Amino acid sequence: MYIKTLTVSDINRYIKKTLDNDFILGNCSVKGEVSNFKFHSSGHMYFSLKDKFSKINCIMFKSSVEKLNFMPGDGMKVIVKGRISLYEKEGVYQLYCSEMKPDGMGELYLAFEKLKIELEKKGLFDISHKKKIPLYAKKIGVITSPTGAAVKDIINVTRRRNKKIELLIYPSLVQGTGASDNIIKGIETFNSMEDVELIIIARGGGSIEELWCFNDEKLAEAVYSSKKPIITGVGHEIDYTIVDFVSDMRAPTPSAAAEIGVFSLEEYVQKILNYKNKLYNSVKNTVNDKKNRLAFVKKTLEVNNPLTYIANEYENIDKIKESLNFKIKVIINGKKEKLGKINALLSAHNPLNILNKGYCIIEDEQKNVISSIEELNKKYKVDIIMKDGTSKVELIHYKK
């Protein structure tokens, strides 16, 4: 019997055609527990559906995701509708989901929620207990698999940000039996080392089963009791474990944990330069301000200098003195002129001046001037005033 030789593409194409034309597989409803859930940046969702015995890979495209009224996650039981087809390039068959609805919670998810509630009641999640992450840790302890992608990411980020940082890698299991005990031992080891300032617990993405060791109660208590601050970077951004709630800081990925824990040398130097420039400008501004203030005070003192004030007042006094002297002279000259006129007038009318012409003045004993003969009959003695003296005479006879 002749058997035709087919290429891999021929086989995959034939299988895909067979699956696509199958009446049941072309439109089926499947229920199971979500595992290894990933929400891609494109908007598509990738996950597995599993039961006790099997699992199947699933994909839901963005157009169908946008119609969901809830966000699925690891451990959640769901019912999906879709079709079974083959991804020819990889030769992998998968369930292409068009609809999804919740169908309860899986056992692991319920166990996770139960432990989370218990530890929260014990206070292991209290924000007040969380230790401050050091800004400039020089030696960092890393607990992770020595061969996984997480340790490579952390080393690469550290080399990029600060080559002077010393990383101490504690090789540990990060999934399966004994993983949580390994991680606890790593925490104890780094706590015993005085120069270790920070601990990073890291692991790459995985299903809820693969990350389950990070939901261990003893590990949660070890993280809580650690004297050194701990950053957890477990799984992808959508993955949350118990240690993420207990740790002092949760990072969405191992790389992000390194970004948080390792300070950038370039940024550190730039910060110092910024502080230097800020200090220089502050001192410069202060000096300039003081100079301006000093110049203002100096100018103010020059204007308000007592000697300057006194000199100005002396100048004002001299001006006032000069003005007063001028006014006094004017007044005196005016008075002199007026007095001269009065004196001339008085001299012209002075009765004593007629004595120089040979006349005389007769006064009675009371110094009253006698100007009529009729006044003499009552007077017996009179004074005759001449230009060079006065003579007393006794009246003997008078003639009218």
From Swiss-Prot:
Its main location: cytoplasm. The gene is xseA. GO terms for biological process: DNA catabolic process. Pfam families: Exonuc_VII_L, tRNA_anti_2. Heterooligomer composed of large and small subunits. One of its GO terms (cellular component) is exodeoxyribonuclease VII complex. Disulfide bonds: none annotated. This is Exodeoxyribonuclease 7 large subunit. Its EC number is 3.1.11.6. InterPro entries: Exonuc_VII_L, Exonuc_VII_lsu_C, OB-fold_nuc-bd_dom. It catalyses: Exonucleolytic cleavage in either 5'- to 3'- or 3'- to 5'-direction to yield nucleoside 5'-phosphates. The keyword Plastid does not apply.
